[in-house]
């Protein structure tokens, strides 16, 4: 039967997930522990019964547990008074005990203590025992008492609450038996059970409290008398009433008693026991207890409860403390007890029993300030600040608290003694029930609904009989049903109660079925709850019962007046119930335990809530209301349902975090790869260059988006089902409390001088290590936060989508309040969700259109896009930034774990102010060379071929050769010096290599020489871009074809994950990439083509993942498996339903393939750091762009390897977003190579010969940026072919630069700049170059560089499909093209355009010619630009755009004369062949120029059809501003 709402709230077992405090450890219990003895006799020589650790209270009551010191009075009655009427006999006993209860009780206490001394019990300090069940489980391990040993009772000295004492069950049992014998109600309640037990709630409750629970509480007071009030701290007082105090019911095993708030005094409350069984006639001290400012309320531990309780509130008292030091005896007559007298006890720990839901009332004030309530004969009290507020002639509406009703005795009484019980109770003063309290009110208005609450409480009760029919319908319609074994018993994995991790498919079906009944509840009928000005922490939490119908939802979006929730489990809605996909929380939503206030402003993004009731949102109130619709039509913007009742499950424990602010107000958190939101009123109050410590909420990230209980073999099929439903990323964490961290900020100031003994002489080694870790970890987290690129966890609806090949163009909103501009950038990884599931992609261009308030985005889709995925048809598509999975590389303590002598630690110490590392020079005459090489590389011999005769390598370095055909190429002396330094075993060397100096060839040569020394040691070659790594692969492939016998077994691979590989453009993929080689290798392994004797290192989990990968990618039919693989498949096939684990697959691949050289980008290197072992050398290309955090990760993982950094400090430093600045940027991104060269930290060699550019270009750049140190390695003739062949285009063929003056104005686009006239000029030039009938240029040989990201996006769209690469200056570092078109865009030359390193990169990309488009007057006045412009003008290559246009049109090579790009693949190939045959020497590089980027033919790029772009936006949808 479906439980009603009231039953749910009454039966629910709340739990406390609040952060622990020191109050929770206060269990001040005295402990009597018996000395060890071999005897098992008690003090009377009788055997002591063994105590079962699992014995229950019922067993204790029947005598199984505990020892009795006196015979039960019933024994004598049964022998001496057997003929007496039972009622008369009991009456006689009760009267005699009642008359002498006080003296008898005190005598019993004295007798008891004497007996305890005889038993030899002692009080000792022991670990805390916090519950009844805890000391029960301990009791079986206690030694038996010895009748021969005696000792005094030593009272434990309680010095502080933090030193609790433990409970000895034997002493407790003795006290309990004494209380049982003295309590007048014992005979009246013994041996009976509570009626209708099955209908009672779980946990301690007023209606299931029993007589033996009262005995436990009274007995426990003898232990609690050691607690002293002066040892408890006073708690701070909150000024305003907190209505929604956390409430719950204590567990069954907890010793407690129920008390009611009877009186309110100035600084305390007086409580009266709810059940007279607790005190009887003999324990008047337990009749009244007080609550004061030392009382701890569960869930409200940090504040005093004074001022927050109502008269009539029920409190569960779980611990007592003596109020007065003079109290020496716990016993007193109940006749002496009075609420006006000082209480002997205070309630030191209490739990608020769940209150009734607030009641809406209509009333008028009486003359004495009370309330006369409509339709009620009983007055109510009103909380008034001033009696003058009460206007007797005005009607008011308000919210009232009504106290609970209960019987004054427990329910386990003997039925025949009921009248006797009532007679005895009449001798005890019983206080009447407290009046209800109106705590919030306002003047009456006709719109206020007073009696609606009762009417709307259960409007669906009559429809519950149809629930089974709805449930059956949902079960049959839900697409997930077939994957779950519904008939099988679905026992929850993690105990009673529902949670997000143990929810079952049947629970989802019940919730969906119940929605047909909840449709009768409407939002307009629910009252709006008042909103609190500040967030309440902690909120009350609880777990829904097993019998409660609910579903779990996650907070996805936060608005000012509502939250949007998304279902955690897709079983709830399947494909057919799109109305249940998103729900709304608004001001009418009730949170369990927080019913009196609105929950708006109290939840975090990412919070998980259990929805226990729905209501139809306003706007969906039609009687013709139809619930189901396809999930693809669901939208977070228009919710069908609101969550009218919710429960907050236990939140994750608050996390302590160290963080710094970024410019965008988000936080970089130490140890995290993603930013966090910060609750801060004003960003002006914080500084970005400081470290703060705070408390954060980290949302729970469920592993599955469907429920438990699925059929394991069908898990992969369920995953396929869920992929067809759009997913949303998890939310960022939220920091809600913080302050400056003084110690960490001191470390921050010392920073890179941590190991400087000159600047800081008194710092200990331990503190130096902490400084390094603090700075490096904060920087590491900052850099990862920036590089991961997810700064927006929102999902946006895609407007007017257009797909062309693997590129999709769409628009998303750019709201003014929370703009997307700046958070959505080129390079962001995205996920697009729609009716057919999800597909991944990467943003290529972002263009702001302020007129309509949208961003225009073009993204490249992943190649693993499902075949059926389409943007056509019904349904909406949403896009969000893809979530990044954290991959911790640096963690707390990483630096301390490094061996003091390893290369990694030595390098880090040098980077942080330690002594420079001197160059290691190997003397070839030294007989120890073999030993050194053996230590460094595991080499026994082989260095002799590099020996020189009698001189050190730094004077005459060995000549090295690069393998090539037909003859090896000799490296120049600077390149040889670099190779020799790496071979000499230096921990770290730096190769300062200007543009075009052949550094790629130098890196490969050094790697090959190391390979010859020892072939079973891996080497890592790291680049900064995929294009550069492809270049290294290209060079390595040519090396293998050189015919060198020493290299015939060389194996290399480019490491790239399968997911990233699917998103790479075609010209960035090779057949040496790991995904390609992995599929080939695993296929050979599966078919038995690989010798298995060499694969003993593989473990079972490797085999399982390999077979899963083969099946998932359909590489081999299982029928064709080799014998050994077939056995594995047959034995382990049950595990193959799971998706393959990527890291395990990579491990298996490297174990089988065993590559010698591994090429990888710096970003992808993280995936290798925990996999590769035995790496002897790491070389890093374009090292000037290497972020310091990446280098630190490499140094930590490969701490025994030698490192070679080769790059140019006169080019761009490591890339960093504008959001990162100050110390976060210095420690995370840094400029390691420049700092190392300037401060002479490591050995350096400088390459000087330039083989890329035209000699005059090299000469000009050498004078501008290198102090004239560069030497050209090529002739002018080799770089002048284009100029000489296109004299119609190029004014002066003897100078390789041309300037086109553009007078068109630029336009601001967000924080960037664009220029439409410049775009047109670029289009004209590109058309001219690639459409020339005599000398057409291959589009892949043209590069367009812009200094502004907005202009880059516009140019990319303008030239899309042409095969011409467009990019920023940063994107072009490491690349080269025959022809470069450089766009300055802005007529106002900004500071960053005048940076020497940026201009150096832009001007050094061209092998033949550079065409500059810019504003002449502006550039004449700019640094460096003025020199370049003057040189061009002196050589006659300065033209005006309009004049140049006219000249080209006279020569008939304009846009109107020739088609843009031929749509015929054959004619295009013919023109390319003709061009290549006529310009062979232009394509061929000089003999020593193997470091260039390989050309990519235009046939690899998608066909361009139609016009260029209709002024860029022609293919874009026209979005109206009203959208």
UniProtKB/Swiss-Prot annotation:
Keywords: ATP-binding, Helicase, Hydrolase, Nucleotide-binding. One of its GO terms (biological process) is termination of RNA polymerase II transcription. GO terms for cellular component: nuclear body. Its EC number is 3.6.4.-. InterPro entries: Coronavir_polyprotein_1ab (IPR050534), DNA2/NAM7-like_C (IPR041679), DNA2/NAM7_AAA_11 (IPR041677), P-loop_NTPase (IPR027417), SF1_C_Upf1 (IPR047187). SUPFAM superfamilies: P-loop containing nucleoside triphosphate hydrolases. Residues 1-89, 1463-1498 are annotated as: Disordered. It is an enzyme of class 3 (hydrolase). ATP binds at residues 993-1000. Residues 1463-1476, 1485-1498 have a biased composition (Polar residues). Pfam families: AAA_11, AAA_12. Gene3D superfamilies: P-loop containing nucleotide triphosphate hydrolases. One of its GO terms (molecular function) is RNA binding. PANTHER family: DNA2/NAM7 HELICASE FAMILY MEMBER, HELICASE WITH ZINC FINGER 2. Belongs to the DNA2/NAM7 helicase family. This is Uncharacterized ATP-dependent helicase C05C10.2. It comes from Caenorhabditis elegans.
């Amino acid at each position: 039967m479906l439980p009603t709402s009231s039953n749910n709230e009454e039966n629910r077992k709340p739990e406390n997930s609040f952060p622990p405090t020191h109050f929770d450890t206060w269990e001040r219990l005295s402990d009597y522990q018996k000395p060890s003895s071999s005897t098992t006799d008690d003090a009377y020589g009788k055997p002591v019964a063994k105590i079962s650790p699992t014995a229950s209270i019922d067993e204790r009551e029947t005598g199984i547990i505990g020892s009795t010191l006196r015979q039960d009075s019933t024994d004598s009655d049964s022998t001496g008074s057997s003929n007496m009427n039972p009622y008369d006999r009991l009456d006689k006993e009760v009267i005699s005990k009642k008359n002498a209860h006080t003296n008898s009780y005190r005598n019993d206490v004295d007798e008891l203590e004497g007996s305890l001394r005889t038993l030899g019990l002692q009080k000792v300090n022991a670990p805390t025992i916090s519950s009844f069940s805890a000391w029960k489980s301990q009791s079986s391990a206690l030694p038996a008492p010895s009748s021969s040993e005696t000792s005094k009772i030593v009272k434990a000295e309680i010095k502080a609450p933090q030193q609790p004492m433990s409970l000895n069950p034997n002493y407790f049992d003795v006290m309990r038996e004494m209380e049982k014998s003295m309590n007048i109600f014992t005979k009246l309640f013994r041996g009976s059970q509570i009626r209708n037990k099955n209908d009672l709630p779980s946990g301690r409750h007023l209606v299931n409290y029993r007589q033996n629970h009262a005995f436990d509480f009274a007995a426990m007071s003898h232990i609690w008398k050691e607690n002293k009030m002066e040892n408890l701290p006073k708690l701070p007082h909150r000024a305003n009433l907190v209505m929604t105090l956390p409430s719950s019911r204590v567990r069954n095993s907890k010793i407690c008693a129920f008390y009611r708030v009877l009186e309110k005094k100035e600084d305390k409350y007086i409580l009266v026991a709810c059940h007279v069984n607790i005190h009887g006639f003999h324990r008047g001290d337990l009749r009244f207890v007080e609550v004061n400012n030392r009382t701890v309320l569960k869930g409200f531990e940090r504040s005093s409860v004074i001022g927050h309780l109502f008269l009539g509130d029920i409190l569960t008292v779980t611990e007592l403390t003596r109020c007065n030091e003079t109290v020496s005896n716990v016993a007193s007559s109940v006749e002496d007890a009075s609420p006006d007298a000082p209480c002997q006890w205070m309630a030191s720990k209490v739990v608020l029993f769940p209150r009734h839901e607030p009641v809406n009332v209509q009333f008028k004030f009486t003359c004495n300030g009370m309330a006369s309530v409509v339709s009620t004969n009983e007055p109510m009290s009103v909380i008034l600040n001033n009696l003058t507020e009460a206007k007797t002639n005005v009607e008011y509406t308000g919210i009232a608290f009504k106290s609970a009703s209960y019987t004054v005795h427990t329910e386990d009484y003997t039925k025949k003694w009921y009248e006797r019980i009532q007679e005895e109770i009449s001798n005890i003063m019983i206080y009447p029930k407290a009046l209800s309290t109106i705590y919030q009110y306002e003047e009456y208005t006709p719109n206020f609904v007073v009696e609606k609450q009762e009417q709307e409480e259960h409007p669906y009760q009559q429809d519950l009989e149809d629930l089974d029919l709805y449930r059956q319908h949902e079960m049959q319609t839900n697409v997930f049903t077939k994957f779950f074994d519904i008939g099988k018993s679905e026992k929850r994995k993690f105990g009673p109660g529902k949670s997000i991790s143990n929810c079952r498919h049947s629970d989802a079906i019940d919730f969906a079925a119940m929605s047909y009944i909840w449709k009768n509840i409407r939002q307009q009928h629910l009252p709006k709850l008042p909103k609190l000005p500040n967030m309440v922490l902690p909120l009350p939490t609880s777990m829904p019962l097993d019998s409660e119908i609910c579903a779990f939802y996650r907070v996805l979006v936060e608005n000012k007046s509502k939250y949007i929730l998304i279902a955690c489990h897709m079983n709830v809605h399947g494909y057919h119930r799109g109305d249940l996909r998103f729900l709304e929380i608004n001001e009418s939503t009730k949170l369990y335990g927080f019913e009196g206030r609105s929950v708006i402003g109290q939840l975090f993004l990412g919070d998980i809530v259990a929805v226990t009731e729905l209501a139809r949102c306003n706007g969906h109130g039609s009687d013709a209301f139809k619930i189901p619709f396809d999930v693809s039509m669901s939208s977070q913007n228009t919710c069908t349902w609101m969550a009218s009742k919710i429960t907050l499950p236990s939140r994750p424990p608050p996390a302590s975090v160290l963080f710094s602010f970024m410019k965008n107000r988000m936080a970089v958190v130490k140890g995290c790869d993603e930013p966090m939101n910060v609750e801060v009123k004003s960003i002006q109050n914080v500084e970005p260059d400081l470290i703060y410590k705070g408390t954060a909420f980290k949302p729970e990230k469920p592993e599955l988006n469907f429920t438990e209980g699925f059929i394991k073999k069908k898990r992969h099929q369920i995953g396929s089902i869920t992929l067809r439903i759009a997913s949303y990323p998890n939310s960022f964490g939220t920091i809600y409390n913080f302050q400056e961290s003084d110690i960490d900020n001191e470390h921050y100031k010392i920073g890179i001088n941590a190991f400087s003994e000159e600047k800081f002489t008194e710092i200990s080694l331990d503190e130096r290590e902490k400084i390094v870790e603090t700075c490096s970890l904060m920087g590491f987290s900052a850099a990862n936060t920036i590089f991961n690129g997810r700064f927006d966890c929102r999902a946006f609806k895609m407007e007017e989508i257009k797909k062309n090949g693997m590129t999709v163009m769409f628009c998303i909103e750019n709201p003014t309040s929370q703009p997307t501009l700046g958070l959505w950038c080129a390079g962001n990884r995205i996920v697009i969700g729609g009716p057919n599931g999800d597909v991944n992609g990467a943003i290529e261009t972002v263009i702001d259109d302020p007129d309509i308030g949208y961003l225009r985005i073009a993204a490249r889709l992943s190649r693993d896009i499902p075949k059926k995925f389409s943007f056509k048809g019904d349904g909406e598509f949403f896009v969000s930034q893809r979530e990044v999975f954290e991959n911790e590389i640096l963690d707390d303590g990483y630096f301390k774990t490094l061996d003091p002598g390893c290369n990694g630690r030595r390098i880090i110490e040098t980077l942080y102010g330690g002594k420079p590392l001197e160059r290691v020079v190997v003397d070839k005459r030294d007989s120890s060379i073999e030993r050194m090489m053996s230590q460094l590389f595991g080499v026994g011999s082989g260095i002799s071929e590099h020996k020189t005769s009698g001189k050190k390598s730094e004077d005459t370095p060995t000549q090295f050769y690069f393998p090539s055909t037909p003859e090896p190429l000799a490296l120049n002396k600077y390149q040889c010096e670099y190779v020799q330094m790496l071979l000499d075993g230096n921990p770290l060397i730096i190769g300062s290599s200007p543009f075009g100096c052949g550094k790629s060839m130098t890196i490969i040569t050094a790697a090959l020489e190391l390979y010859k020394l020892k072939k079973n040691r891996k080497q890592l070659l790291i680049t900064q871009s995929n294009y550069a790594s492809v270049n290294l692969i290209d060079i390595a492939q040519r090396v293998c074809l050189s015919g060198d016998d020493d290299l015939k077994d060389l194996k290399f691979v480019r490491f790239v994950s399968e997911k990233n590989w699917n998103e790479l453009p075609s010209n960035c993929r090779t057949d040496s990439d790991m995904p390609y080689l992995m599929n080939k290798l695993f296929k050979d392994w599966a078919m038995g083509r690989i010798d298995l004797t060499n694969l003993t290192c593989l473990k079972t989990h490797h085999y399982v993942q390999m077979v899963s990968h083969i099946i998932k990618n359909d590489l081999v039919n299982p029928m064709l498996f080799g014998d050994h693989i077939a056995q594995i498949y047959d034995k382990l096939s049950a595990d193959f339903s799971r998706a393959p684990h990527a890291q395990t697959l990579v491990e298996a691949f490297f174990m089988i393939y065993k590559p010698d050289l591994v090429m990888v980008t710096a970003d992808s290197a993280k995936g290798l750091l925990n996999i590769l072992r035995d790496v002897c050398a790491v070389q890093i290309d374009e090292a000037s762009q290497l972020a310091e955090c990446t280098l630190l990760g490499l140094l930590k993982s490969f701490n025994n390897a030698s490192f070679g950094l080769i790059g140019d400090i006169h080019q761009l430093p490591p890339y960093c977003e504008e959001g990162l600045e100050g110390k976060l940027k210095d420690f995370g991104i840094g400029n390691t190579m420049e700092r190392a060269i300037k401060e002479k930290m490591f050995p350096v060699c400088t390459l000087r010969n330039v083989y890329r550019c035209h000699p005059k270009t090299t000469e000009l750049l050498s004078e501008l940026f290198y102090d004239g140190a560069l030497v050209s390695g090529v002739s002018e003739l080799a770089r002048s072919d284009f100029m000489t062949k296109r004299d119609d285009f190029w004014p002066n063929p003897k100078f390789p630069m041309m300037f086109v003056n553009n007078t068109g104005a630029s336009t601001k686009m967000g924080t960037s700049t664009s220029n439409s006239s410049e775009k047109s000029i670029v289009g004209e030039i590109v058309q001219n170059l690639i459409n020339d009938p005599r000398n057409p240029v291959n589009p892949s040989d043209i590069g367009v560089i812009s200094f502004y990201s907005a202009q880059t996006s516009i140019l990319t769209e303008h030239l899309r499909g042409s095969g011409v690469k467009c990019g920023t200056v940063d994107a072009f570092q490491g690349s080269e093209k025959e022809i470069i078109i450089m766009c300055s865009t802005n007529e106002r030359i900004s500071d960053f355009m005048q940076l020497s390193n940026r201009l150096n990169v832009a001007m050094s990309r061209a092998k033949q010619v550079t065409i500059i488009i810019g504003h002449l007057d502006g550039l004449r006045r700019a640094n460096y630009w003025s020199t370049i412009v003057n040189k061009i003008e002196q050589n006659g290559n300065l033209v005006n755009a309009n004049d140049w246009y006219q000249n080209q049109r006279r020569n008939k090579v304009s846009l109107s004369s020739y088609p843009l790009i031929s749509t015929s693949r054959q004619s295009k190939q013919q023109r390319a062949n003709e061009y290549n045959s006529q310009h062979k020497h232009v394509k061929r590089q000089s003999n020593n120029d193997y470091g260039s980027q390989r050309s990519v033919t235009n046939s690899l790029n998608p066909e361009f059809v139609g016009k260029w772009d209709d002024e860029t936006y022609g293919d874009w949808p026209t979005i109206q501003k009203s959208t």
